[in-house]
Amino acid sequence: MFKSNQKTRYYEYLIKFNIMRILDKNDIKLKLLIAHGSLGKFFHLKEFSEALEKLGVKTMLVKDSDFSTGFPSKRPQEWFGMNKKFIDLINEFDPDAVFIDRQSHFGIDTIKSKIPLFILLRGHYWSEIEWAKKTLHKGPVIKTVLWFRNKIAEECFRNATAVLPICKYLEDVVKEHHPNQSTFPFLEGIDAERWYNVEGMELKHPCVGLLQGADWWGKTKEMLILKKVMKELPNVNFYWVGDGVYKDKIILELEKFENFNWLGHLQYPEKVREFLSEIDIYALVSGMDLAPLTLKEAQLMKKPVIATNTGGISEMMEHEKTGFLVEEGNSKDLIDKI
């Protein structure tokens, strides 16, 4: 976690000693084109862009699909063509490098344009794709779409200038799949000054708050241990903020308990701040996580935190000092910590 000036200094280190070293540039006055994928991560890349501007780096932040599309997509008219918008964007901004946060046609077009490409990797892509094959993508059409998307992702990973995983655990994973690729951890800090207590939303106490998505079964399935936890702790209320393709599957199992409440999606950061202000304990119940921002945010709000000891979580917190780690699948351990 950083205060604003600390965060800016960290990004200065990142630019000077990693990106500029790879680009073989001695002057920090470079032009970086930043492309975001999901709207949920726009806020953080905007902060990144603003911090770099303070250092003299000229940046432009765009949505990747506004400028670069192709097969597979839901709109057949996007399957063919030269992505003229992308070409015009490059000609207009003339970047020294491109920074993306998902593997997409924007990355492929950057590689074809022979512009240095840096990929911010937040998730365990290879585990996600395997779980998608097992759980979501069983029909021939969807399997074909998944094959093409994986082909795009692997081409991005293989031909990028560098891949920037958000923790050391994930860097090791990248090296397993692409041992010759340049990597360095991108510690995605957050501005500590944004996370302060406000008047919270109305919740029943005592309560445990969960703030996590449900788009990947390998990660989401761990939430099912809450059935045993809520049964043993009927007087503790559990509030889940999150959404995703497995939302209904989780709710179907957990709504059987009167002490479970699903709050859906909350506006970020204002409503999330209200939620974190009110809860008594923050819990991250996950089958795989790397360096989740919500865990950092809860810690900044001075909330007791409990998290599954998986992925890169142990890099973020020290057991029994800055929070409690519980082993995956161990509902008794989670009950005891609560």
Please place each PLM-identified region on the residue numbering:
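Aromatic "clamp/platform" in nucleotide-sugar-dependent glycosyltransferases that forms part
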Residues: 287
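Short hydrophobic beta-strand element within catalytic cores of glycosyltransferases
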Residues: 304-307
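Donor nucleotide-sugar binding/catalytic pocket of nucleotide-sugar-dependent glycosyltransferases
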Residues: 154-197, 205-207, 211-213
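Acceptor-binding helix/loop patch of EC 2.4 sugar-transfer enzymes
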Residues: 67-72, 119-151
